[in-house]
Amino acid sequence: MRTAVVYYSYSGNTHRVGQLIIGVLKSKGEDGIPVRIRPLKEEVSFIKQCRDAFMRKKPKIYRTMLDLKDYDRIILGSPVWAFNAAPAISTYLEECRSIEGKEAICFVTYGSGAGKDKTLKAMKEKLTERGAKVVAEVSFQQNEGLESCREKLEKIL
């Protein structure tokens, strides 16, 4: 199975999980391709990033692999900011193509945990609206150990 692991990471936590997913897929003999989403003009202030997430702004992003036709599955990841996914992920969900009928998994990384369920639900709803079949969702606390993260991933991949 060929999987696109699409994520946005500001501090590195979501990137760490994205790379762990690639490793777990590889250990199962599957092909996982990392796709790191980046806004064209990224706000450097975390507070301003959270404000943009709260206001549901959708920044322009680099045109990184928007067409998913060559993939069987998409794994979509975001940090939780102000009870929402990162704005760049919202843009990606609007602009990606060939998602209909694909298997999908959502994951979030978080600090306090406030808003993680709401964020996963919103990501799942958007993927479903676009025609994907969401088969799993999972969350990772920012200080969660790698072994615990790996165990969660082994159960859903």
Language model features with spans:
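Short, glycine-/small-residue-rich phosphate/pyrophosphate-handling segment
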Residues: 105-141
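Short beta-strand->loop
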Residues: 7, 78, 107-111
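N-terminal beta1-alpha1-beta2 submodule of the flavodoxin-like/Rossmannoid cofactor-binding fold
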Residues: 1-77, 83-95, 128-133, 145-157
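Acidic catalytic loop of the alpha/beta-hydrolase fold
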Residues: 82-83, 113
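A glycine-biased structural micro-motif
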Residues: 100-103
